[in-house]
Amino acid sequence: MVAAGPQPPHPGQGESPPLRELRGVAERITYSNPETGYAVLRLSPERRDGEARAAQAQADDRLVTVVGTLGDVSPGEAIEARGWWKNDPKYGWQFLAIDYRTTLPATVQGMKKYLGSGLVKGVGPVNAGRIVDAFGEETFDVIDQSPGRLIEVPGIGPVRAARIAATWTEQRHVREVMAALQSHGISTSLAARIYKRFGDESATVIAREPYRLAREVWGIGFKTADKIARAIGIAPDAPERLQAGVLHALAGAADAGNTLLPEPELVAQSCALLEVAPDGLRGAVDALLDSGDVIAAPLPPGPPGPPPTSSGTAPLRDREPGRLIALAPFARAEAGLAARLRALAGATGAGERQTAAARIFSAVDWSVAFGWLAQRHNLRLAPEQEAAVRAALTAPVSLLTGGPGTGKTYALKGVLTLARAKGLRCVLAAPTGRAAKRMEEATSLPAATLHRLLELRPGGKAGRDRQNPLPADLVVVDETSMLDALLANQLVKAVPQGAHLLLVGDPDQLPSVGAGDVLADLLRVAQSGGPSLHPSAPFPVTRLQHIFRQGAGSGIALNARRINAGEMPRFGGPIQDCFFLPAETPAEAAQTVVDLVARRLPSRFGFRPGEIQVLSPMHRGEAGVGALNALLQERLNPARPGLPELRGAGRTYRPGDRVLQLKNDYDLKVFNGDLGTVLGVDAEEGELRVALDDGREIRYPAASLYALTHAFSVSVHKAQGAEFPAVVIPLLTSHAALLGR
């Protein structure tokens, strides 16, 4: 093994630099980018070639810098890296790692650092020192083979010893997965996720079905899985590779919001990804049709229609260019959504087919009802709001839409007040915890996230469905612009026949993050032409247009309307709540954002920094989400003596940090888009204690931190459905592609 030693001369121009090996313990992480995996770390190199141990004892004085795609290497982890030395004009000598693998450290200091890094649950820095002091270089052998001896260490009882042993065993399995993935650039956290998904079958899946990694493990893309597949000998034109490429192209379309693709476009995208001729791709599509992984439907003569029904359109074997291809879950979800909405909307007329609310309100004198709302509850509704109330209580399915400040919540209060006065069971929900909490505050009634309401479980299973529907006569869902096809289908399946469904939302907001622009599609189907009800709509739509909230003096409301109408926003003059500050460069814009949050807005308006949310259109760049989070954390919540920290997935968390959940975690019952604040760090257990904005408190184990990120700055899409006292948004020329209406 080549230790660091004196750095070799940098190879001259045109020469291939000699590959070297470097082994040591990561002492600290100087920089890391979780999105790209690029990191800069300081390494204490090991000498394992018989040289005196005294040289190793001086390692603190001869740390070396390692740069490269290092995933989420944590302080204390031992790594073996291959690469070469380079003399950077600005930063000096660095080891550029082209690949690496993590190993167990062999030195006493390395063992202490490793055990105390949070990788082993139940062991913090203090207990790590005690364990290694007790067992010395035999520490890992003791934990591995005689974990019962851990109770010999002061402060460690049987319960903690058992927890340490269990975590160590799991880490051993993860290291075995890492060994199978050596040279493929897979980080430790990804290996842990692979093991969590496949367990003892991980090595078999990697060796025989590597493309499953891309489909079933969050954070592993097709290119990584393809690299592994090619390394184990899967041919470029192998059927499994071609089919995996087609599925990846459809999954990419879903990430962009599309539930299906025309076949020619699908083939073209797959060819570009796989670098193969289109002939083989057509066979791959047919094979996926036969297996049921995808579903085909003919392209209608007009605009694309819905996918086939859940019973399935027979796979088309002709080569008509208009064939549409969808991943089976999306095709079935859209078909199921359409069929269930038709069934719910069909509960009209009289008798048993009529809903409970319709039976009650069909004979109501609405002038009396609205007068009662005004006199008894001080709810004085505008005519368009009255139309929304009538629709919600007489039609089985109705939509209520409008921009910010147009009185949607006020109209909803009228609906709920009348419904509850007649004894109807009302259930309220929204897609995110923050939106549900805001709904609850506005209506003074309980509201839940859709995930909790529907009792969603891993794999898309739901506790509430046609066989176990919601106990409700009226189901109200706010922020429906955030509904994707899969979630909307689960929702309508849980609405009992005979209940009313009221969908509330702003069609001018961004579409859902997931595939399927449900609200926009429903509005197109309803063919609503204005604020009043369209007589031919299959379900009534009320669009509120008059602004009631944030009145004439509000620059926010006025500029929102101007932008929506394609007009330039106006700043200055009497407008005192909407400002524009110019910046020459992205770096200057980023510094202006930080100064606004940390100093200027608190000083002028009295906002606390925690009440100010930074939104960025893009993740990358000097004024992107990632860079702004780093700058804002350093300014608002920097490292300081006595403040505990926990590192995970390339990020460092401290009490007071704002955080955001990136994907659904059914074990912790936290979901994509949930926002919160770190309350505390338990270094011994390797846990974060987070207070979510919806009032719940969650303990995050270190293994779950890969799905958490900082939220001093978030993307505009992630903030959908939320409201904040103050918002700062950098808008740069580099964001131009994302700044359309």
Regions found by a protein language model. Name each.
Residues 24, 124, 157, 221, ...:
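Residue-level signature of catalytic and energy-coupling elements of molecular machines
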